[in-house]
Amino acid sequence: MENFIGSHMIYTYENGWEYEIYIKNDHTIDYRIHSGMVAGRWVRDQEVNIVKLTEGVYKVSWTEPTGTDVSLNFMPNEKRMHGIIFFPKWVHEHPEITVCYQNDHIDLMKESREKYETYPKYVVPEFAEITFLKNEGVDNEEVISKAPYEGMTDDIRAGRL
């Protein structure tokens, strides 16, 4: 797992949604969403479960304060990932509520989860191509430290950020 921890990745799902993740340590991630249903959302210090399934294959899973469940299988050597996201009904119907720096709005996420319907879940199972991969070390607070903006992933891939 030591080669996986510290990984900073940008990946694009087959449906076109572009995400960025930093495996901060063995139990925490930071991420930004650059396109898709909740583009503009970003989160730091999300508690996760990380396991090595077999050589070169890692699973990262978590439940968010929104009630969204996520399970991602990374195959960095293959530049592939398979993810499945279980969005609660309310997130699918009101995604704009979640498009923020979640850490500053945890109470709003919990209130919305209680206020709106959560079922049926909107399930998104997709493969993705990893388009950027760099090990940034453990607990690097600079990797994901600002809101996503138009062209950010191009800046990261070009080394400008």
UniProtKB/Swiss-Prot annotation:
Domain of life from the UniProt record: Bacteria
Biophysicochemical property: temperature dependence: Optimum temperature is 40-45 degrees Celsius.
Induction pattern: By ferulic, p-coumaric and caffeic acids (at protein level). Cells extracts from caffeic acid-induced cells exhibited lower activity on the three acids, which indicates that caffeic acid could be a less efficient inducer. Up-regulated by salicylate.
Entry's pH dependence statement: Optimum pH is 5.0.
Effect of R41A: No ferulic acid decarboxylation
Annotated keywords: Aromatic hydrocarbons catabolism, Decarboxylase, Detoxification, Lyase
Consequence of substituting Y13F: 2% decarboxylation of ferulic acid
Residues given in the record as substrate binding sites: Y11, Y13, R41
Biological processes annotated in GO: catabolic process; response to toxic substance
Enzyme class: lyase
Gene Ontology MF: a single term: carboxy-lyase activity
Similarity remark: Belongs to the PadC family.
Family annotation (PANTHER family): PHENOLIC ACID DECARBOXYLASE PADC
Quaternary structure, from the entry: Homodimer.
Entry function: Involved in the decarboxylation and detoxification of phenolic derivatives. It is able to catalyze the decarboxylation of ferulic, p-coumaric and caffeic acids.
Protein name: Phenolic acid decarboxylase PadC
Organism the protein comes from: Bacillus subtilis (strain 168)
Protein's gene: padC
